[in-house]
Amino acid sequence: IGVLNRTNVLVLASVQSPLPAGYSVRTGALFPVEETSSGHVILAFSPEEVQNRYLARRPESERANASARLERIRLNGFEDTPSTMIHGVQNLCVPVFDTRGVAAAITSGFIKQINAPATAQETLAAIRITALELSRTLGFRLETSPFEAALSQ
């Protein structure tokens, strides 16, 4: 789970794969927002002024694509994309909300393992359920949110 920390994403907690082999990110790690699905998911559900500050820091030639990515994430309610840092890893990322809005993002670095039963779609569904449960614990109310689609299945 990651949160914004200025222009970075701070990894607050990391869980090891339940399988014998896997990929994980170190708790406490900092990554530039633009290099992470967590950063983009948090930004996609952040207030417009936060998004505009982020877009203003991007090179002008990248702004339209960055803006379109944020819009896609808002429409889908999640991001499912190849990792920009690790080949072969598929980032599955979902927002976590509190009473004020987006608070964090949960990301699974999905790697399809031979003979492993879970698919990316099943993993994403599980992450969405977990994000909704965590959001409710933080005071989020699905019924009153403009981002209902982000966490509803």
Annotated model-derived regions:
Residues N8, G101-V102:
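Residue-level signal for well-ordered, solvent-exposed loop/turn and beta-edge residues enriched
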Residues V96-T99:
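Sensor-regulatory modules in signal-transduction proteins
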Residues I1-R6, V15:
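Short hydrophobic alpha-helical segments used for membrane anchoring or interfacial signaling
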Residues V11, T81, C93:
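Short hydrophobic/aromatic beta-strand element in the GNAT-like acyltransferase core
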